[in-house]
């Protein structure tokens, strides 16, 4: 079902958009339409990343741009993250996963839940932040995602998975995000508020 080969180049309109006009919601809609136009079933045409997740992605974009000093790279990372999330969502909703893969889905859910709670705890409890702990959890999530989509998606999408998780699991990026006196504290606050909402709503 993977349709990477027919995509536009990364220089498509919108790539150079600034942090105040970047919208993960719009990017998700564009990616979704492109992916859905190339698969037989249209039953997931109403699938969108929810508003809370969209807000988290937007804040991650801003922090990524601050960390990389590269608007285009920040956009590409978030675009890859959204594409991967949508493709996995399509596979799941269309019941494309085998029984063995459904077990991996549950492992991934638990690992994402653990990672989310750890992220919030590190923000809420002073002096507990440990880059290595959070980086390890994110790499474990990455390995489970690779295992889950192994027989469904192309090497190009596996490359996207690496691109996304290697960035967010990078200890220097995590230090930028959690820096107690850095510019990203307001972003981290909004990210953790969003994560808490997803946890309360049993989405994570």
Swiss-Prot record:
Any idea what a deletion of this gene does?
Deficient mice develop normally during the first 3 months of life under pathogen-free conditions. However, following subcutaneous injection of the carcinogen 3-methylcholanthrene, deficient mice exhibit markedly delayed skin tumor onset and reduced tumor size compared with wild-type mice.
Instruction: Indicate where this protein is primarily found.
Output: cytoplasm
User: Ranges of Acidic residues compositional bias?
Assistant: 1-10
What does the annotation give as the result of altering residue 60 to W?
A: Reduces binding to phosphoinositide
**What ranges does the record give for the region Binding to phosphoinositides, renumbered to this chain?**
21-204
Record's Pfam families?
DUF758
Where in or outside the cell is it found? Cytoplasm; Cell membrane
**Molecular function as annotated in GO:** phosphatidylinositol binding; phosphatidylinositol transfer activity
UniProt effect for mutating residue 33 to Q: Reduces binding to phosphoinositide
Any one GO CC term of this protein is: cytosol
Which InterPro entries does the record match to this protein? TNFAIP8-like, TNFAIP8_sf
- Tissue specificity remark: Widely expressed (at protein level).
Q: Which UniProt keywords apply?
A: Cell membrane, Cytoplasm, Lipid transport, Membrane, Transport
Question: Impact of changing residue 38 to Q on the protein?
Answer: Reduces binding to phosphoinositide
Disordered, as annotated region: 1-20
Q: Which domain of life does the UniProt lineage start with?
A: Eukaryota
GO terms under biological process: 1-phosphatidyl-1D-myo-inositol 4,5-bisphosphate metabolic process; phospholipid transport; positive regulation of ERK1 and ERK2 cascade; regulation of apoptotic process
Protein family according to the UniProt entry: Belongs to the TNFAIP8 family.
Q: What does this protein do?
A: Acts as a lipid transfer protein. Preferentially captures and shuttles two lipid second messengers, i.e., phosphatidylinositol 4,5- bisphosphate and phosphatidylinositol 3,4,5-trisphosphate and increases their levels in the plasma membrane. Additionally, may also function as a lipid-presenting protein to enhance the activity of the PI3K-AKT and MEK-ERK pathways. May act as a regulator of tumorigenesis through its activation of phospholipid signaling.
Q: What is known of its domains?
A: The N-terminal domain (AA 2-20) is essential for its effect on cell growth and survival.
This chain's protein is named: Tumor necrosis factor alpha-induced protein 8-like protein 3
**Gene that encodes the chain:** Tnfaip8l3
């Amino acid at each position: 079902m993977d349709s990477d080969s027919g995509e536009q180049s990364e220089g498509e309109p919108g790539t150079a958009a600034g942090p105040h006009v970047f919208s993960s919601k719009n990017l998700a809609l564009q990616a979704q339409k492109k992916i859905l136009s190339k698969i037989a079933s249209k039953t997931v045409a109403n699938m969108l990343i929810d508003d809370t997740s969209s807000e988290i992605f937007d804040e991650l974009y801003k922090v990524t741009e601050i960390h990389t000093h590269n608007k285009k790279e920040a956009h590409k990372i978030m675009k890859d993250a959204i594409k991967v999330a949508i493709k996995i969502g399509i596979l799941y909703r269309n019941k494309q996963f085998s029984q063995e893969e459904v077990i991996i889905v549950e492992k991934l859910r638990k690992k994402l839940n653990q990672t989310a709670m750890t992220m919030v705890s590190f923000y809420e409890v002073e002096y507990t932040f440990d880059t290595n702990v959070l980086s390890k959890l994110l790499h474990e999530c990455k390995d489970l995602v690779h295992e889950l989509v192994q027989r469904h998606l192309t090497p190009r999408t596996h490359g996207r998975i690496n691109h996304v998780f290697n960035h967010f699991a990078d200890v220097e990026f995590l230090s930028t995000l959690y820096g107690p006196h850095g510019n990203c504290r307001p972003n981290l606050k909004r990210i953790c508020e969003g994560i808490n909402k997803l946890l309360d709503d049993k989405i994570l």
